[in-house]
Amino acid sequence: MQLRFRTSLAVAFSLVALTACGGAGSTASGGTTSSTAGVAALPAVAGAHGAQARAGRDGAHRLNSPTCSGTGQHSFVGGTDGNVAAGLDATVAGGFQNGACNFYDVVAGGYQNDESGTDDAIAGGDFNLVTGAYSTIGGGYGNADNTGANSYSFIGAGYKNQINDPNKILTVYSVVAGGESNQTNAEGDFVGSGDSNFVGSTANWAAIAGGQSNAVIAPYGFVGGGQANTVRSGWGAVGGGYGNQAGEIATIPGGKNNLATGEGSFAAGVGSTASYAGDFVWSDFASGAAALKGTAANQFLARASGGVTFYSSADLKSGVTLLAGSGSWSNLSDRNAKSAIVPVSDDDILAKVSSLPISEWSYTTERGVRHVGPMAQDFYAAFNVGEDDRHITSIDEDGVALAAIKALNARVERRDALLDAKLAAKDARIDALQRQMANLAIEVSALRRTRR
C-alpha cells in the first residue's frame, strides 16, 4: 500500500509538471485559454481563498466540488484549501476545492476538479469532472467525462469538452485532446481540438481532428477539419472545407458544399454531388456555374471551365489538352517535343490505306452502338506505328489520313496538269483551224468576186 501511495504521489507531481510546461490555458495536448496552474494562479484577495474573484466567471460552472468527504486510507492531500482525498491511495497534490473521491484517483491541482471513478487523473484546470474509471483530463476549464461508463477516456485540455453517454452506450477508450465544447458519445472516438465538434452515439471508433461544428454520426467516420462538415454513414471521410457531407465509404477531400452519398463515391471542388455508387465528381469554382451532379453509377464527371490538360510524360512534352470551351481534345504536337523525325512517302501511305480493310462494327460492351473504322491489328501491320497492335491513337490515325490526302491531292494536281496541257493543245489546234477557216472564207469570197 505504501508503494501505491508513493506511485500516486509521483503521478500527481508529474502531472503538475506537465501542466506547468504546457503554459497557461493548455497542456501538451493544447486547448483554449484557461487557468491550469492551480492555486498559484489565483489572485491574492481576501475571502475564502480568493473565491470572490472567480464568482462572476465561474458561477454557472460550479461543481460543488468536492463531492465527497473524509480521508481515504493511504491518501495524500498537498494543501488544505478545501481539497479532499477520500479514496484509497488517492492524491490531491494542491489547488482549491478539488476532490479525489475513489480508489487511486489523482488531482494534481487547479480549482473545483472532481473525480468519482477509480484510477482517474486530473492534471489541473478549473471545473473538470471525471466519473469514468481509468480516465484522464489534462487540464482546461469545464471539461467533463460525464458517466461511469466512460472508462479509459482522455481529455487533454480546453474548454467545456465532453465525453458523454446520453443513450447509455459505452463510451470507453475515447479521447478529446483539446479545444472548446467538443463532444464524443460513442466508443473509441477521438476529437483532436477545435470548437463544437460532435461525435454521435452510434459513431464508434470515429475521429474529428479539428475545426468547428463538424459532426460524425456513423461508425469509423472521419473529419479532418474545416467547418460544418458531416459524415452521415460508416467509413465516410471529409478532409476539410465547408458544408460538405459524406456517406458510406465516400470521400470528400475538401471544398465547399459537396455531397457524396453514393457508396464509394467521391466529390470535390464546389457544389459537386455524387449520389450514385462509385461516382467521381469534381467541379471548379466558376462564377454562376450550374451544379454538377452524377446521373448514373460509376461515372467520372469533371468541370474545368479554364481547360484541361493531361500529361503522359515526366517532362510535360506529351499529353492532350481540352481547351476552355472546346469540344475536342488537342494533342501536344510541338516540334520541340519530338525526335527521330523522318519524311514519309505519301504515295506509299495512300497505297496502304487503299488496301486497309474498313469495317462497320460494335464494341462488345455497347452492342447497340455502331462504328466504322479499321482493326488495330490491320492498322499496325500496315503502318507499324503506335504502342501495340491493340490500340490506334488518334494522332497516328490523323497522320495517316493526312498523308493519304496529300497523295490524293498530288495525284489530282498531276491529273489536272495533264488535262490542262491536253486542253491547251486542243485549244491551240482549234485556234489554228479557226484561222485556217477564216483564211479560206476570205479566199472563197475573192474567187466569187473575180467570176463576176
Task: Enumerate the predicted regions with their spans.
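Bacterial N-terminal signal peptides that target proteins for export
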Residues: 1-9
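C-terminal motif of bacterial Sec signal peptides marking the signal peptidase cleavage site
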Residues: 18-20
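Bacterial signal peptide processing site
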Residues: 22-25
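Boundary at the C-terminal end of the N-terminal hydrophobic targeting segment
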Residues: 28-30, 48
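Long, low-complexity repeat tracts used as extracellular stalks/passenger repeats
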Residues: 35-39, 418-421
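Periodic small-residue-enriched repeat registers in elongated scaffold domains
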Residues: 37-321
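C-terminal intramolecular chaperone/autoprocessing and neck/assembly modules of extracellular spikes
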Residues: 298, 304-404, 408-452
